[in-house]
């Protein structure tokens, strides 16, 4: 049957991905005492790499229910393989908004024997918001939340400030081995790969991958605007420039904008350069980055995409309302004819292009992020009373370095301090090697 074929296909890809995810495999090998005998509600893109995370959590003792945090990001063969192994997963590619909400709500009541969640593993904060707003009783036995992405972390800090956050949370996004690898290298690689299918780079990889698969355009000699120059924006800009594009940056933070200038990028405001660009990429996490005045200034067949978590950066509602017609070119590629006679090409309906039009980040960088997630879940679940008070916390530097160490063993060899060097620098031989406030 089709379901069996999908599950078998997914299982083969999961086994292949495990070779590139040494951090998660090390967790399985080194934690056979099963430190996570717990019910975890997970909401994160249901991809092959996420399947390896889910099965790691299960091997560590957890009962898991899962949904995807984006209506387009599920890889159906990955979901089928996980479902075939007996794990409750509620996700498929191309969900409606109503189906998406049904999925994340249904997973909360799908634990065996009527049990409720003890932990939340979130990406974007949707499950956290749902439980806080609609199912507050579930928080009584919830020991904590780990959050994957910038957008969700921002929401947690806002909830904490307003007195609405009721359980401690760990900010996985700002672990160095997440933000400086997944956000930076993963995004840019996917973007490029989706532009040229034989390039396998990492966030630098996934952006290009998405654009290429969707449009088949040549990037070289094009003008590209990247809105936002955080870690994700940096990766996108580097990927586009590496493909031969002339890249313009828009940014609100003067320090980050100065960084972009020093990297050789033109820094401008969107209104002044919207008529010059062939490709637009939003990577800000903010709303209304591209809207009416920008659409009307754009070239014919300008390509617009978003790599921020939510679909608020591009004013898609205005496009739908004001366009003369919409032509669907292929899945997640739509061409809007405006009243001025020019067309706009929108990818993935303004949602994550690297997962809507491609397969997301590579297994290696996702292993880094997901190993942080596993360690965060263990830290919260096994914490002594008062170790993680109500608030938003970080994993300690020692664990961040351990995540890096597990993955470096696959890629290279690490130099060790001698006892004399350790004494001279006043740094333990096994780390941590940097202070908590060190900026990599």
Curated annotation (Swiss-Prot):
Ranges that cross the membrane: none
GO CC aspect terms: cytosol
One BP annotation, GO: one-carbon metabolic process
Enzyme Commission number(s) from the entry: 3.13.2.1
Residue numbers binding NAD(+): 149-151, 183, 228-233, 251, 307-309, 354
Residues engaged in binding substrate: 47, 123, 148, 178, 182
Entry note: cofactor: Binds 1 NAD(+) per subunit.
CDD domains xref list: SAHH (cd00401)
Catalytic reaction(s) noted: S-adenosyl-L-homocysteine + H2O = L-homocysteine + adenosine
EC main group: hydrolase
Pfam families: AdoHcyase, AdoHcyase_NAD
Record's keyword terms, sorted: Hydrolase, NAD, One-carbon metabolism
Cited SUPFAM superfamilies: Formate/glycerate dehydrogenase catalytic domain-like, NAD(P)-binding Rossmann-fold domains
Pathway: Amino-acid biosynthesis; L-homocysteine biosynthesis; L-homocysteine from S-adenosyl-L-homocysteine: step 1/1
GO MF: adenosylhomocysteinase activity
Cofactor annotation: NAD(+)
Function noted in UniProt: Adenosylhomocysteine is a competitive inhibitor of S-adenosyl-L-methionine-dependent methyl transferase reactions; therefore adenosylhomocysteinase may play a key role in the control of methylations via regulation of the intracellular concentration of adenosylhomocysteine.
Family: Belongs to the adenosylhomocysteinase family.
Name of the featured protein: Adenosylhomocysteinase
